[in-house]
Amino acid sequence: MTVLYISDQPGLEVFKNGKWNPVNHVPDCLVINLGDMMQVWSNDRYPAPVHRVVVDTDAERFSAPFFFNPSYQTDIAPLADTSEKPGYQSINWGDYRFRRAEGDYDSYGEEVQIDQYRISQP
């Protein structure tokens, strides 16, 4: 999960319905962005948005993100819910984070995504 403070300049966008959409900007407010592990824990009830920041080079923009992550030893799986089957296999956060970081460098690894842990439903 990310808690993001944004000053008075907008720029955060989310990809939805096949296009980039600006996030409604409210000055001096906090934006909460749920990440991949929250999507897995919630079994897709709370999807992690694909997002980006578009910078206006004529205006100064300040943001202060705070990232909250589980312990590296934590195994992440959908929380128990008897009404639906789990959509993901268990993911170790430390291994996942390491593989994501490796994927940032072409010569070290592949860009791992949570969809690689999705369980196919018949």
List the model feature ranges, each with a label.
Residues M1-P122:
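C-terminal flanking tails of non-heme Fe-dependent oxygenases
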